[in-house]
Amino acid sequence: MNNLWEIEKKILEKTTLSNLIGKLISIKPKGKSFWALCPFHDDKNASLSISDQKAMFSCFSCNVRGGLFVFYSKFLNKSYVEVANMLAKEFDLDFHFDQQEKEKYNENEQLFIDVTSIANHYFKVSLKSQVHSNSKLVDFLKSRGISRETASEFEIGYDDGNFWKIPNKEKKNFSFFLSNNLIVKKETNQYYDFFYKRVVFPIHNSFGDVVGFSGRALDENNIKYLNSPESLVFKKHKILYNWAKAKEKAIQEKKLYITEGFMDTIALYKIGIKNAIAIMGTNLSNEQLELIPKDIELIFFLDGDQAGKNAVYNILKKIIKMRSKISVIENDSKQDPDELLKQKGANFLKELIEKNKKPAIDYLYEFLLTSKYNINNSEHLISFVNDFAPLLSSQNNIVIDKYENLLMKHSINIRKFLTYQNQKYDRINQYNSLQQRFYEEPKQKKKANSREEILKKQYQNLYVKLLLSLLNSNALLEYFLRHNIEERIIFEQTNNGQESKLKDILRKIIKIQKEKKSETTIEDLPLEDQEILRWYLQKDSWFKSDYAKEGDLDLLANQISESYLEYEKSQKISKTLEMPSLDEEKQKILKRVILQRRSKND
């Protein structure tokens, strides 16, 4: 049997979709369906529905839906073929899809995989043979606690300097050994090993194939680590060290320990923690994060020095709104996990992990107060709240209440920075900050829908229509410049609030057009200006219509001026807004033009 959908059907004849999904997440029956918290987004309301009758699942919040293989593939980060093989084995079904499985790589990628596989085998054999005669290597392995078992488990090898002799230089794929930096060509046309006299750690991708290496120098006087360059198959920001081996255990325990380096991950393995990976640095990329199922708790255990603490802070700040289960092992020792194991022993390391684990939000709070801000300083206090409030907004009400009470001691009302009834701070704040760019807050209270406000928004809308029209038609923009229409718009003279921002956008459009001398689009503007215009586009579908005639542009300019004059009249009773500083003579001329236009229309 080699048909994916046929094997899925056979599996569901032996069990139900809810039974299989229930092995991965907690589900509850309700009516004819089962319901669960959706693992594919930060779900709080059990939005995932599972129907055995239809053999389908569906989330009503994030709209992900599909059958058995879709769920398992997304949840386990496996291909359909991998899922089919796994479940077929579990239900004792005959399934062979080897040819399709090989198609995960194209021809060139497969050559890279083959080359790194050859190198990996050579390095492993070399290590085994060298430990009997190479005292420097033996001393290094002992000092790092790398036993025969550890070397075998993590496929650690050694480059004795003779690997360059293995590939046949006449063969076609020899160039792949060079491009992989396994072999380097000297100016004298001689070859040598890139990882010469180094202990080599293979780096596997999610499929378990070796895609690159990191070589550790035995001599401390040399560069400590040399890494494979990025290639067709090796992209460092898309790979987690040891993920291929750790993911099954991580999925079972719903936990994943995240370290900086190879030896830290190996140290945790030695004390029985097999669900650990290394990010190979101090940054966790979005691509790396996407490899890990969302229901798995991320437990960060980075180096204890200030650089390590800064790294944890930066990572948490980035991902705290993406994941609901994040913890940190607080490490105050200024050492990494590997050093702690060597110097303090396994029991100390286990106890540290057990006792010093804390929620990410607690770590962030303490980090801000100990490493960045002095809460007793008023300026620091404002900066602290601005930094901490968005992080706290992703938490539930219990956590928010805890910090509300804690910060009240410092006269900080954190609720003022969060949304009502536990809505997400970032969403409402993004909306409010955008609103503030458009409309200046009045200096005194006004009725919500006062005539003044209505007129103000009306001429702003007209002005935005002008800007979008100029962006939508290069011919109109040229007409606008040629006939000096800008000079006829009263609204352009003001310097208040959003009017000033829109005026600046118009000037940028004109400047871009003169410099570019080609079609000007909204994408040519700075991001902030694009955001303002797109906000209006979302508000009113009328903006999406282009002006087709030049006469419309003249009419629009007059409409803007008329609208502004109407608004100007409504302002006279208010002391909060100032009259625009217009030359008296110019005002008379402009008003005369408008009156003439009105009489023609009548």
From Swiss-Prot:
One Pfam family it belongs to: DNAG_N
InterPro entries: DNA_primase_core_N_sf (IPR037068), DNA_primase_DnaG (IPR006295), DNA_primase_Znf_CHC2 (IPR036977), DnaG_bac (IPR030846), DNAG_N (IPR013264), DnaG_primase (IPR050219), TOPRIM_DnaG_bac (IPR034151), TOPRIM_dom (IPR006171)
Annotated Mg(2+) 1 binding sites: 260, 303
EC code(s) of this entry: 2.7.7.101
Catalytic reactions of this protein: ssDNA + n NTP = ssDNA/pppN(pN)n-1 hybrid + (n-1) diphosphate
GO cellular component: cytoplasm; DNA-directed RNA polymerase complex; primosome complex
Class in the EC hierarchy, top level: transferase
Zinc finger (CHC2-type): 38-62
Record keywords, A-Z: DNA replication, DNA-binding, DNA-directed RNA polymerase, Magnesium, Metal-binding, Nucleotidyltransferase, Primosome, Transcription, Transferase, Zinc, Zinc-finger
Co-factor note (free text): Binds 1 zinc ion per monomer.
Free-text comment about domains: Contains an N-terminal zinc-binding domain, a central core domain that contains the primase activity, and a C-terminal DnaB-binding domain.
Family of the protein in this entry: Belongs to the DnaG primase family.
Subunit-structure text: Monomer. Interacts with DnaB.
Name of the protein in question: DNA primase
Lineage, opening ranks: Bacteria, Bacillati, Mycoplasmatota, Mycoplasmoidales, Metamycoplasmataceae
